[in-house]
Amino acid sequence: MLYALDPNGETTTATMNGGYITNNKAKEGAGVYIYAGNPQFGDSKSKADFTFNGGSITNNVASESGGGIYVTWNGNVVMNNGIIKNNTAGIAGGGVATYDQFVGVVGGQKVPYSRVGAPWNNWPNIYRAGFTMNGGSIDGNKATSNGTNKLGDKGVGAGIYIASA
C-alpha cells in the first residue's frame, strides 16, 4: 500500500513509476491513499496529487471508497500508463476515487464545508477533484452497494468515481 499524507494541509504528492500494489485491504484507498491533511478553508495550496506512470494496482479491497486509488482534498489523479484491475470498493470508485471534499462531518452531522468557512461559489475554484487518463488500462473493477458515502452515493464508479462541486 502507498500512503501519503501532509499533516500541515499543504500539497501531498506521490508518483508511481513501476512495481505492484496488490491484495491490500482498507476502509479507503486500499492500494493508494493520498490525503492533503487538515487544510485551512480557502487555502488553495491544499491539494493531493497522484501521478501513475507505470506498474499495476490490482486485487485491492476498500470497504468504502477507492479500492485501487483514493485521493482527497483537491484530489487529482493523472494516469499516463499502468494497470488498475480487479479492485473493489464497498461504496464508490472500485478502481479510482477522487474527491474535492465539499461535504464533511461537523458535530456528527453531514454538512457542506461552505457552512464552516469556504463559500460554495468559490469552492470549485479552490478545491477540485479530477482524473486525467493519457494511457494504461482500467479493467474489471467493482463498486458494490454495501453502504452510502457522505454524498449519499452507493455502488457507483466501478472504474472511476469523481466527486467535485
Predicted region positions:
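Surface-exposed loop/turn motifs in large extracellular/passenger domains
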Residues: 1-25, 33-61, 69-88, 96-165
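The feature encodes a structural signal of leucine-rich repeats
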Residues: 30, 66-67, 93-94
